[in-house]
A protein has these predicted regions:
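Thiamine diphosphate
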Residues: 1-149
Length: 149
C-alpha cells in the first residue's frame, strides 16, 4: 500500500507518542467518514504501545471502522527498555510482556483478529483486511530489538 496523495500518512514524531497509534487510527477513520472518504486506515503498532489505549479497539469495532491494525508482538516495551539504558536505570521491572493475548483481547472488543506466524499469512490477512468493512487486528510475532531513540 503506497501513499498516493495528501493526507495519506499520519505520524507522531519524537518519543512522546507511545500509546498514540491505536486511538489516532480511530480518529483518522472517523474524520474520513465525516469527510465522505472511503479508504482503509492502517495502524502499525507495537504490542507495548498498544497496551496504553487498547480500549480504542472497542470504539473502532462499534463504529465499524475500516481500520487494519498490524501489531508487532515482541513481548516487551522496547522503547522503555532503551530509555532505561539511556537514563542508566537498569533492571526496571514490568518491561517484559510475556503472554499477551492481543488477538483474543481484540476479538473480545468486537474486532476481527488473528495471530500470524509467516510472511505469507501476513500478506493474505492484510489483503483480506483491506477489503473488509470492519476493524481487523493482525498480530505479528517479531524479535525484540533495541529501540532507536
Amino acid at each position: 500500500v503506497a501513499p498516493d496523495g495528501p493526507d495519506r500518512i499520519v505520524l507522531r514524531h519524537g518519543q512522546r507518542g507511545i500509546g498514540w497509534g491505536v486511538s489516532a487510527a480511530v480518529g483518522v477513520a472517523l474524520a474520513d467518514r465525516d469527510r465522505g472518504v472511503s479508504r482503509a486506515v492502517i495502524g502499525l503498532i507495537g504490542d507495548g504501545s498498544a497496551q496504553y489505549s487498547v480500549q480504542a479497539l472497542w470504539t473502532a469495532a462499534q463504529h465499524k471502522l475500516p481500520i487494519v491494525y498490524v501489531v508487532m508482538r515482541n513481548n516487551e516495551y522496547s522503547i522503555l527498555k532503551s530509555f532505561a539504558v539511556l537514563e542508566e536505570t537498569p533492571g526496571v521491572p514490568g518491561l517484559d510482556l510475556p503472554g499477551l493475548g492481543i488477538a483474543t483481547l481484540a476479538r473480545g472488543w468486537g474486532c476481527h483478529a488473528v495471530d500470524v506466524e509467516t510472511t505469507e499469512e501476513l500478506e493474505q490477512e492484510f489483503k483480506t483486511a483491506l477489503g473488509a468493512d470492519t476493524t481487523t487486528v493482525i498480530v505479528v510475532r517479531t524479535q525484540p530489538e533495541k529501540a532507536m531513540l
